[in-house]
């Protein structure tokens, strides 16, 4: 998939704010500070998603229109301790509504920090996606920060942790070096059936 144009078209804080569905869309979810915005910018090959040093900055569902045909959807980060219980409940309701009612959703990319073992919240997200029958792929982020001598160990660690939930594709990526970006774009292209 070659991304020719991209623009943020909707910042949704309620389901009523969602734009009308298009041919297809893919969504990106992960813990706060996992590198979602950086990964989106790497996929877009331009800086359009706001990258913050403050965890939990994305509190809405952000819809990016890609090639005037598809949405790449940035979901709020989870697992940030300084978010109130009320905000966590609101986030869960908003995201669950998106997962269950958005018929154009083709795939969720679950972003997990490749430097550390999967966190409890990552495993809970896998269980939640499975319970909602939402297809997903695991994307390891920040792999440029993992020493070459430790990469196999880290990949095996993640495969083992997620294997108890089933067999899933795991794509190692780096928004810094570009590792895995083409693999992700090729998978998205196949999902959205764009040639």
Curated annotation (Swiss-Prot):
Family: Belongs to the TRAFAC class TrmE-Era-EngA-EngB-Septin-like GTPase superfamily. EngB GTPase family.
GO CC aspect terms: cytosol
NCBIfam families, per database record: GTPase_YsxC, small_GTP
Keywords: Cell cycle, Cell division, GTP-binding, Magnesium, Metal-binding, Nucleotide-binding, Septation
Species annotation: Thermotoga neapolitana (strain ATCC 49049 / DSM 4359 / NBRC 107923 / NS-E)
One GO term (biological process): division septum assembly
Pfam short name (any one): MMR_HSR1
Gene assigned in the entry: engB
Gene3D superfamilies according to UniProt: P-loop containing nucleotide triphosphate hydrolases
GO MF annotation terms: GTP binding; metal ion binding
Protein name: Probable GTP-binding protein EngB
Annotated binding of GTP, by residue: 30-37, 56-60, 74-77, 141-144, 173-175
Ligand binding (Mg(2+)): 37, 58
Role this protein plays: Necessary for normal cell division and for the maintenance of normal septation.
